[in-house]
């Protein structure tokens, strides 16, 4: 029989539910009065944000960074739309909802360009052209981009007949000159030391003594390098300072509220995760011990998969489903988990029972988290080519997480850290040795860490009331989902000439 909720668990449940409700109200309030109209620019998914009832508005085109999506830029889009701009935000090839992979020619040639850069610049120009043709658009387009998009937008601006103010966030582009872009805001997070220097270099092309937070001018050229306090490369997108700077640069004189949704997103996602802890106690108590593994055997299980997993990933799986690198990642995790499962099954035995209620709670909570993430923070639903990609990834992540769940069962913090670090170090080492084979998929490393932090916590709480087979199965599916939904897609072959 399920145990009754203790007072601490009941208190957590009440607080978590209140946090979720409050966050949802605030996040939807940030959208109130803003039209969000889906657009399709050829094969590019995009969204138009504008004030309800606005007849005419200046255009702003918003572009995300590598591995990002329109959702990651929505605080910016909502802020600018509320300030009176018509904002078009879009997903680059291979990212977000885009069904078209990027060119695999990501490494620069002798001229300093790459096939991927050429492809994304062309896509950006197509989006700008289509956005300018929308009814009610006035004036030249403003351009706003983050990280990777900063280089793409500067190159695109040089090819446009006219361009309005440009804002680059976490910029690294070396295409900025003392003359172009003419009106340029460069924003960085306080923790982005190197990129803050790049921002100052851009400002000092106009005034050698330019400082952060200072607007400098030379004729028609205007520059400003500004810093958002406390935040880094991702947090800068939700910083109120970033949002105010963008509003004031692109819509001067408009003292409209900014869409400071970052804390509410964290509260919503944190509330969903926290709710699993009290919910888990409602499960029937069917906990089963994991295999008895001493430190010596544990070390063998950590070291044995490293070399075969890395070598096989480097030499096989180059092109699967027409995508580059994806097969290698699935192979790495599958071999790693397969070796560990084989050793565990032979020497210790495996749990073989699946508890439907525990599995349903784990998958249901994970789905709820994914839906909230996808609506408010970042693209996190597998669509289009990412659906078969999830099935492929599951061939690797299921054995990996089944082995992981058996080894993590009743393990102390030291073993849990080692279980996370060993595959990360092996895969990271393989990427460093052969970046042209595995480097395009480096984003799986931070995704895996976030997966363990979020979904691993859910699995640990639910795992106290079930066995490792149930948790391994559930987390294996969720890890496949996470990789498939978030990994940038590169084609296995390119026909681009650049």
Role assignments for model-derived ranges:
Residues 270-307:
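Juxtamembrane interface at the cytosolic side of transmembrane helices
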Residues 300-498:
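Alpha-helical transmembrane segments of integral membrane proteins
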Residues 9-10, 261-263, 295-299, 351-358:
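Alpha-helical transmembrane segments and their helix-start/interface "positive-inside/aromatic belt" motifs
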Residues 255-268:
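Juxtamembrane/start-of-transmembrane alpha-helix segments at the extracytoplasmic/lumenal side
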Residues 2-40, 45-48:
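An N-terminal hydrophobic leader/cap segment in hydrolases
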